[in-house]
A protein has these predicted regions:
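N-terminal charged helix/coil linker that caps or initiates catalytic domains
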Residues: 1-45, 78
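Glycine-rich phosphate/adenylate-binding loop
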Residues: 2-18, 131-135, 140-148, 160, ...
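Glycine-rich phosphate-binding loop and adjoining beta1-alpha1-beta2 segment
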Residues: 67-108
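Hydrophobic/small residue at the entry helix of a nucleotide-binding pocket
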Residues: 52
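Conserved SAM/SAH-binding loop
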Residues: 116-125
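Conserved N-terminal Rossmann-fold NAD(P)-binding element of oxidoreductases
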Residues: 46-48, 71
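Conserved S-adenosyl-L-methionine
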Residues: 61-67
Length: 273
């Protein structure tokens, strides 16, 4: 490299750094130099890119996280438009991972996105990961997959944020954070707790070390001749509101940011919004 080209490269790098600072410097002012650097350097995994996980991934990209792994096997459908950030007329039929990766590239061009078109199960986890995760966000709607993620995270000490069911909820302000042991009014997380205790040796009393995002709001049952309710986070049967699903996703992202910015803290913030 000639002195001239080296100088040009240095200028380009300086311009890129300045651009990133303009985009994401607000986080530095909030979390301080060290916390900001931790967030920027983090590798965060989001499992499930529906009405919750898609907003989580977007929030992480807009917070300057430099490495994301996005895991989901589904394609964008018209029924996703009311609650999923990557669901647009122009993205119908695309893999959710690809549609969201393209969106993230426009938000944070320097973000390294690994798009993994798979559903998590005991046969492929953690093999789906190409590198160590600093935090995993479980926004999937399958209890077996949630148990695989939670058991692995508890065994290896990887910070995990597990999200409960958002379908049938209307009160976004009632979303809260608690240890899995203290979660109520969420059958999916209750089933996860039972699986961890019965199949993975989790204690019957005391904290379980799994940070959960959930709501104690009673579920509003589908009106009229709606399809059968399946209790899942992806809202097939229950009605769904983006105001609620996105709030779940944003709270999960906030927990992940706290965990990577302040790794000594246990479980991020607790309590209601």
């Amino acid at each position: 490299m000639t002195p001239g080209s080296a100088g040009a490269a240095a200028v380009a790098l300086g311009n890129e750094d300045a651009d990133l600072e303009r985009r994401f410097g607000g986080l530095r002012r909030l979390y301080g130099d060290r916390g900001y650097a931790q967030v920027r350097a983090a590798h965060v995994v989001v499992v499930g890119l529906g009405g919750v996980g898609s907003w989580t991934a977007e929030a992480l990209a807009r917070s300057g996280v430099d490495a994301l792994t996005l895991v989901d096997l589904d394609q964008v459908a018209e029924s996703n438009v009311n609650r999923q950030v990557q669901a647009l007329g122009s993205t119908l039929g695309m893999a959710k991972t690809d549609a969201l990766a393209a969106r993230i590239a426009d938000i944070h061009p320097g973000c390294e996105v690994a798009a993994v078109e798979e559903f998590v199960d005991e046969s492929n986890w953690p093999g789906l990961l190409a590198r160590r995760a600093d935090v995993v966000i479980d926004a999937c709607d399958d209890v077996r997959a949630k148990a695989v993620l939670a058991a692995w995270a508890r065994a290896g000490g990887t910070p995990l944020v597990s999200v409960g069911a958002a379908g049938g909820k209307r009160a976004a302000e009632r979303v809260e954070v608690a240890d899995l042991a203290d979660v109520t009014h969420d059958p999916m997380l209750a089933a996860l707790r039972q699986r961890l205790r019965k199949q993975h040796g989790a204690p019957r009393s005391g904290p379980l070390g799994v940070c959960c995002v959930f709501s104690r709001e009673p579920v509003a049952m589908p009106a009229g001749d709606a399809c059968d309710v399946d209790g899942s986070l992806n809202c097939h049967g229950y009605g769904s509101s983006v105001a609620v699903t996105a709030t779940f996703g944003m709270v999960a992202a906030a927990q992940a940011i706290e965990l990577v910015a302040f790794p000594g803290a246990k479980g991020g913030h607790r309590g209601r919004l």
